[in-house]
Amino acid sequence: DTGKDWGEKLWTFHRDIAERLKQEHPGKKLLLSPYTVTIEPPKTFDTFPDNVIISHVDANFEETTKWCKWRKLHTGEYGIWIHNWIANQTSRYTPQRTPLFIEKQVKFFQEYGVRGIFRDGLGEVYGLEGPTYYVFGRMFDDPANLTARELVFEFCDSAFGPDAGASMRRFYDALYHSIELYALYLN
C-alpha cells in the first residue's frame, strides 16, 4: 500500500510498465527520471527490471548520499542529467567548469555505467571554456587513459598552433586555477 505517497505510486506504476515492456518488447529499455516527487528511491520494492535506465540528476563526480541510495537499488545502466553549464549557476559570461572537473566527471560516469547524458545548459563561453568543452567531448573516447592535461595541450596546439599554443596553455592554466574551487566544490 502506497497510501498518499505519490512518488511511491509513480515508482510502482513505472516498475509495472518496465515489466510489461520487457515481456512485450524484449531488448527495449525504459528511461526513468527521479525528479520532484520521485527523487527518492522506491520503498516498496528493492529492484527494477534489468531493462530500466535511471536518468539521475544528483551526480557530478562523486558518490552523493542520493547516488548511493540509488546504487543499492539499481545496478543497471544510468543516464545523467548534468548542470555543468546552466546559466543560473553564475554569470553566463564567465567560465563555470574546468578541464579537471570534466575529467573527474567523465571517469565517474564511466565507472558507474552511465550510457546517456542530458546537458541542462549548453555552454556559451567558447573563448574561455573552449578547452573544457573539448575535454568534455574527447574524454569519452577513452576515459580510462586520457587526461584533461594532455587534452588541453592537444586543444591549444590544434586551435592556436604550436607557437601560440604554449602561451594559451599558460593563459588557460591561470584562468582555470582561479576558478577550480568553484568548479569542483561550490557548484
Regions found by a protein language model. Name each.
Residues T2-N187:
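Substrate-binding groove of N-acetylhexosamine-processing glycoside hydrolases
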